[in-house]
Amino acid sequence: MELNMIIAAVIGLGAALVLMYVVLRKYTYPAVEQPFFSDPSFFGLFTVGLIAGTAIFVGYTFFYGSWYAILIAIAFAAIFELAKLIVLNLKRYHGKSDTLFYGFGIGIGIGGAFAFGFAFYASSIDEMPAMSWILFGVIAVQTVLLHSATGMTIGEGIARLRPFEFFLQALIISVAYQLLISQVFVPDQSEMLIYAFLILSFLLALGYFHHVVYKKLPKVIREVLRMEGKSRKDIPL
């Protein structure tokens, strides 16, 4: 049991920490002299995300055996994104470019905690012996990718003062992902379909993450800074 917990932590929280380093290193010291966000605020929201992700996962376990149900998938997609919106939609974050990173922080916290909980819980269920650690790892990584990206999307909405427009965008992506990954848990699902849905959900999470973090982020930072009447010449490409 203790070994399972350690492995689950490495899979879930480890993926979150690695992704955090890869994304943020270009936006903070020493890559730039003036970081694009406050470390205390970021890690405070990351901690809030860990707590929220843990609470959501505890609720998720009550529906074990129905994880494949469409209504459950949609409901939890909404809960995930509402948690991010409620935390970020405070006046102190409105119209500020660093809110993008705080959205990323709470999202990656939620994703990391949920991935850890899922890996540990699933590994302890006798009825799921075929679920390998490799499968847990893939689900953990895509969970972290998805929630960090949708968190940044909601952060963009708060920064642009259009929170509900971007919340809806994040919700659509989250619902699509949950509907795909839920099919992995259909009773007596064929192995071929399990891997097909796993690949599709991974491609969705990875594609959306790449779009938000690598394609859009520099441009969005410039636009929000312009809204604030500011500019920077050190925005990473």
List where the protein language model places each region:
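Hydrophobic alpha-helical segments at protein termini of multi-pass membrane proteins
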Residues: 1-237
